[in-house]
């Protein structure tokens, strides 16, 4: 067969397709609701474990039965197709029942981020016009004061440990919250209600809404549909991830993020993989549960992988990892080698994998896999996804190896920002061929072999006193080229009354701090313009701080200006 000649443009050549089968490339996205997709995949396996909540296994038979109870209860509360329902919940069984029940009805699950300010929560709730909210008791204090100022009429509450039975609830002293509808009474209200089995599938109906962080402006609702989430499921089903029925998926990313609810929850749940629910974001608890339940799949950050290595370098559980994926940050090649050696020592046949994504694109854009796992990359586009770089000034597509804004064609993309048409129009750009590109705001490039390299956010920059635009990720990459540096993130902080860049770093303990800093100076002088030098370095002992989303906590780092080392 004659090899196809490359044009030089990734969107035309799609060189990553050589890593995929025809089945993956041409896989049909199911035209049904998310619930129907999950049901169709698992109706013949009623005894398989769908969820694992601490030590309690929940079968698909029980899952579907509970979803029907919750569906009837919401119908009794007046929830109907097209309604928005606010959820302020971590990953508990009741949260999953609720999301799927609302999907059966045709309602939209609005996943509120409990770390939002009271004003953010108030604004986001009111713009949805939701009359019903579901919140776990443990997060009720986050919304208690704002509820009178919102459109919410009915508040359903439930202890996070509700599914663990009466003895555990007694030990945890779970109490009903006054002036709310307890979970038990909520379910009781629907006993005589009929289900919504006659609700037919419609294309691009809103299904789940997550929210942007709001760190660079007002948070916005990111509207995902049945089609977009089913497309995400399809990408994972056919693209070589080897998700085998009754494998175990460690779901530690909060479900109010797209990656948390779509990639680490609905994808494995649909494909018959048992989801290990983790309602509390705590590294020590994560280690205990990984050691105990021995998951095969996990998407996480460098910080947790480092924690596991340092906590207990050798553990029988680590051998079971088929796909240990780091997303949301660059993994330096020498650190990747260390992680691979660690997995090998534990008897795992897998290597560390990397991925890149964003909420607006359903969670995953690129990923490494069994046939393509190159050091330093964010992987290749998923089988039905296209990625290319575009010139920041002209908006023209760039050829291989040229850096620009990464833009994405994906069936997993959001339908838009909720009630923000201007922001939606800015995010999506339609080209002359009628293709709608998602403009990620990330700087990067694509190589001839199909691998995607992500440098960082274009906005991750500032203008210095000399009027120069300094991209912080360029400083990070230079520092990370020093093999004794394990992690690095550069942020802008106010130091001595002016804005300047500070490099936050974690070192391997193979050399003295003085030796490593001297090496950083030498490497940065060879690779960076003088005004880009990292003259201020903040060292962290174990790992850089991580936010509940699993991403690096840049807000905390910007505020942390104590004990900074000045490098002349």
Q: At which residue positions do the language-model features occur?
A:
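Conserved AMP-binding/adenylate-forming core of the ANL superfamily
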Residues: 30, 47-92, 96-100, 117-122, ...
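AMP-binding/adenylate-forming catalytic core of the ANL superfamily
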Residues: 95, 116, 133, 410, ...
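Conserved AMP-binding/adenylation subdomain of ANL enzymes
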Residues: 230-248, 257-299, 307, 311-312
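Gly/Ser/Thr-rich phosphate-binding loop
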Residues: 296-300, 309-374, 386
């Amino acid at each position: 067969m004659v090899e196809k000649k490359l044009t030089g443009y990734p969107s035309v050549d799609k060189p990553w397709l050589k890593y995929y089968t025809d089945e993956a490339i041409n896989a049909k996205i199911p035209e049904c609701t998310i619930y129907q997709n999950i049901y169709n995949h698992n109706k013949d396996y009623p005894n398989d474990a769908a969820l694992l909540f601490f030590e309690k296994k929940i079968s698909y038979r029980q899952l579907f039965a509970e979803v029907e109870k919750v569906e009837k209860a919401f119908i009794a509360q007046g929830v109907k197709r097209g309604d928005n329902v606010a959820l302020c919940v971590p990953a508990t069984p009741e949260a999953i029942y609720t999301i799927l029940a609302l999907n059966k009805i045709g309602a939209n699950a609005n996943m509120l981020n409990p770390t939002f300010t009271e004003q953010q929560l108030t604004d986001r709730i009111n713009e949805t016009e939701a009359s019903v909210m579901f919140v776990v008791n443990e997060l009720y204090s986050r919304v208690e004061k704002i509820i009178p100022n919102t459109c919410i009429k009915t508040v359903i509450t439930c202890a996070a440990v509700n599914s663990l039975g009466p003895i555990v609830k007694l030990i945890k002293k779970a109490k009903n919250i006054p002036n709310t509808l307890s979970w038990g009474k909520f379910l009781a209200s629907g006993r005589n209600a009929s289900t919504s089995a006659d609700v037919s599938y419609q294309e691009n109906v809103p299904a789940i809404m997550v929210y942007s962080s709001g760190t660079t402006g007002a948070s916005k609702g990111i509207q995902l549909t049945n089609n977009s989430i089913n497309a995400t499921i399809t990408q994972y089903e056919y693209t070589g991830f080897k998700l085998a029925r009754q494998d175990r998926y460690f779901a530690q990313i909060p479900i109010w993020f797209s990656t948390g609810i779509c990639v680490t929850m609905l994808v494995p749940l649909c494909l018959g993989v048992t989801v290990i629910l983790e309602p509390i974001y705590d590294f020590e608890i994560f280690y205990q549960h990984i050691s105990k339940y021995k998951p095969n799949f996990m998407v996480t950050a460098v910080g947790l992988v480092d924690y596991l290595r340092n906590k207990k370098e050798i553990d029988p559980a680590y051998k079971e990892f088929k796909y240990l994926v780091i997303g949301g940050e660059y993994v330096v090649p020498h650190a990747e080698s260390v992680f691979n050696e660690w997995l090998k020592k534990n008897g795992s046949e897998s290597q560390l994998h990397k991925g890149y994504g964003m909420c607006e694109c359903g969670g995953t854009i690129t990923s490494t896999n069994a046939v393509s796992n190159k050091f330093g990359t964010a992987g290749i586009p998923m089988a039905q996804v296209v990625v290319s770089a575009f010139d920041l000034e002209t908006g023209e597509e760039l050829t291989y190896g040229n850096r620009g804004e990464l833009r994405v064609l994906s069936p997993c993309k959001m339908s838009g920002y909720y009630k923000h048409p201007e922001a939606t129009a800015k995010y999506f750009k339609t080209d002359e061929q009628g293709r709608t590109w998602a403009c990620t705001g990330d700087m990067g490039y694509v190589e001839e072999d199909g691998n995607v390299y992500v440098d960082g956010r274009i906005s991750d920059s500032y203008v210095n006193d000399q009027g120069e635009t300094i991209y912080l990720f360029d400083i990070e990459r230079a520092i990370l080229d020093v093999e004794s540096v394990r992690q690095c993130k550069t942020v802008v902080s106010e130091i001595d009354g002016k804005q300047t860049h500070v490099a936050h770093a974690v070192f391997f303990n193979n050399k003295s701090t003085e030796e490593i800093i001297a090496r950083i100076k030498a490497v940065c002088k060879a690779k960076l313009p003088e005004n880009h030098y990292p003259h201020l370095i903040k060292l962290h002992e174990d790992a850089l701080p991580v936010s509940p989303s699993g991403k690096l906590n840049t807000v905390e780092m910007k505020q942390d200006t104590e004990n900074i080392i000045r490098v002349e």
